[in-house]
């Protein structure tokens, strides 16, 4: 197995950009042959089930008759059918015995959690090459990749002669929602997990990946008792690999399994133990009588079951994102480039609770000089919504629409299109009228993946203006001060989302459902700039999603943001507005996991 290698090369391509192989059913059949022997494990397997037999009865699922020959071989009969011999592995965590096995010559297996104190059982059936159909947001359906591990969860019990079946079984839960954990497996793998939604979770691979980026995957949470829960995630739209474990919050320990194919198409099927630490808790905002005991799913219209077997809430945005070349986007921009025009499909729909515009720049002339050979721009502001600018060395002034906010005391935040730019570009400018510092976020259409995605970078400098005496060395700077924090942002009374600042280089957003339960998530790389104490710039492009950029200034003192959206596509290029009122929901203590470290990452 790969974790026994002395050193595994770290993945340095973001998972949402990596081109995973479209493994066929036949290829997967061959790769799964070793699973007939059961999983491997660094820790010693448990013999708690050796020599025993269990009849597991599930609600709305199979009846599983197990005979455990020893601690590595079992015999299974499903629903009274033919007995099958297979390898397995078992681990214990307090009173819970967890065992995992695949069924030879199939792409199917079971992962079973047995509570020896109550005889209650949770069963995860897993399979590959599902041919499963899922709806996507435009109303169409897609067939998921064969390599994506599917799961179906059944709740049940161990049948005991002379005892009545229990009325209450294990169940789904929102009790874990909002919790954050650090885990270190016996394999050496280190992971941060943020359980920010009842249907999804964020995870940061601290050892597998070269970059500290957060990702989102559909997840399930099952409550065994007040301190023991079961968690799973499937890396849908990425490798399709499946991670599952039982955890005890009293001792902050876990026992689990990992099944699937990594980015090198290598089989990973191993069990693990781990130790961890709770790193924080976010508030969850659904009604007090909502206990999260129902699965949140999106149902495919063609699936006859309700909900369909294996159905789950999966956000697959890139599946309906229309690819455009750089030149196609530019031709669309020549036909239509708009600034701050209200349309139903424009980012102004995200500005219902925006901050007011300011006229503090009207009548001012100034020069913004950026470091290290960066641009030098001269400005004349004669109106509240129109400005003139020219690049250093130009003789002709360009006139453009602009919008400006006073985001903090005498701190101006404004934006405009760069005239006739190719690719189309805009600038978002922080101008401090107290100390003379400025930061420019340069945004333009196009990445190396899509012409209709945006890209951006930050440049730092000073302002030359009457009454200002800017410093020579002090600048605004990139920061990690927001890392771990979560805010809800309400753009209109009908539109709210939670933003979680997962790492110094990434950010996720989670959609609130009707009763404020947190549901679907997506994530992307980003940058954070500190402008003042408590005031920050956040820039994110919704990569492998819709390609739109959000560039906002967050004032944590008033819990309000304001800013701009930049996007382009077949309808042209648009510079719009973003603004929301917020609530601080909590924070994870995770900053110390990031940055330059003396230790060498990897396993």
Residues covered by each model-derived region:
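Surface-exposed interaction/gating patches
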Residues: 45-57, 161-205, 209-213, 357, ...
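Short, solvent-exposed coil/turn segments at beta-strand boundaries
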Residues: 46-52, 67-74, 92-96, 113-122, ...
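Short beta-strand segments that buttress and anchor functional surface loops
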Residues: 54-58, 75-78, 98-103, 181-185, ...
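Contiguous, well-ordered beta-strand patches that form the walls/edges
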Residues: 81-113, 208-249, 393-429, 514-558
């Amino acid at each position: 197995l790969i974790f026994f290698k002395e050193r595994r090369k770290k993945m340095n391509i973001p998972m949402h950009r990596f081109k995973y192989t479209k493994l066929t059913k036949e290829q997967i059949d061959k790769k799964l042959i070793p699973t007939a022997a059961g999983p491997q494990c660094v820790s010693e397997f448990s013999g708690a089930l050796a020599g025993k037999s269990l009849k597991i009865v599930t609600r709305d699922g199979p009846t599983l008759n197990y005979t455990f020959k020893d601690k590595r071989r079992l015999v299974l009969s499903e629903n009274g059918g033919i007995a099958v011999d297979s390898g397995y592995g078992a681990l214990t965590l307090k009173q819970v015995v967890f065992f995992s096995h695949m069924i030879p010559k199939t792409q199917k297996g079971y992962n079973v959690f047995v509570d020896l104190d109550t005889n209650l059982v949770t069963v995860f059936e897993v399979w590959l090459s599902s041919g499963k159909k899922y709806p996507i947001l435009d109303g169409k359906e897609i067939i998921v990749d064969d390599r994506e591990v599917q799961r179906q969860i059944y709740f049940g019990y161990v049948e005991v002669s002379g005892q009545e079946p229990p009325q209450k079984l294990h169940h789904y839960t929102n009790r874990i929602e909002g919790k954050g954990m650090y885990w270190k497996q016996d394999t050496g793998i280190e992971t941060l997990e943020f359980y920010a939604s009842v249907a999804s979770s964020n995870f940061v691979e601290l050892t597998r990946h070269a970059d500290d980026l957060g990702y989102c995957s559909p997840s399930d949470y099952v409550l065994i008792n007040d301190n023991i829960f079961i968690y799973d995630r499937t890396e849908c739209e990425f490798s399709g690999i499946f991670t599952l474990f039982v955890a005890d919050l009293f001792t902050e320990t876990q026992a689990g399994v990992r099944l699937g194919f990594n980015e090198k198409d290598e089989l990973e099927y191993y069990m693990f133990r781990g130790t961890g630490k709770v790193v924080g808790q976010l508030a969850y905002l659904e009604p007090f009588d909502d206990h999260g005991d129902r699965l949140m799913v999106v149902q495919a219209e063609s699936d006859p079951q309700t909900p369909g077997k294996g159905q789950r809430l999966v956000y697959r945005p890139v599946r309906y994102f229309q690819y455009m070349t750089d030149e196609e986007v530019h031709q669309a921009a020549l036909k239509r480039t708009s600034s701050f025009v209200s349309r139903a499909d424009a980012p102004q729909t995200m500005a219902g609770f925006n901050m007011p515009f300011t006229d503090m720049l009207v009548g001012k002339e100034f020069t913004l000089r950026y470091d290290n050979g960066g641009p030098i721009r001269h400005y004349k502001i004669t109106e509240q919504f129109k400005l003139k600018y020219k690049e250093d060395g130009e003789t002709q002034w360009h006139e453009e629409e602009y919008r400006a906010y006073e985001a903090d005391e005498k701190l101006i935040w404004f934006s405009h299109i760069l005239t006739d730019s190719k690719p189309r570009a805009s600038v978002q400018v922080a101008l401090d009228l107290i100390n003379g510092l400025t930061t420019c976020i340069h945004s333009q259409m196009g990445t190396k993946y899509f012409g209709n995605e945006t890209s951006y970078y930050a440049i730092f400098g000073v302002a030359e203006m009457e009454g200002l005496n800017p410093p020579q060395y002090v600048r605004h700077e990139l920061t990690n001060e927001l890392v771990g924090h979560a805010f809800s942002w309400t753009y209109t009374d009908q539109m709210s989302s939670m933003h979680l600042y997962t790492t110094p280089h990434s950010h996720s957003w989670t959609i609130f459902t009707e009763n404020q339960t947190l549901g679907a998530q997506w994530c992307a790389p980003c940058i954070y700039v500190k402008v003042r104490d408590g005031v920050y710039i956040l820039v994110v492009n919704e990569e492998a999603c819709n390609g739109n950029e959000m560039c906002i200034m967050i004032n944590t003192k008033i819990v309000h943001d304001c800013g701009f959206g930049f996007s382009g596509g077949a309808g042209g290029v648009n510079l719009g507005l973003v603004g929301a009122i917020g609530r601080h929901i909590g924070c994870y203590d995770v900053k110390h996991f990031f940055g330059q470290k003396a230790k060498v990452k990897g396993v």
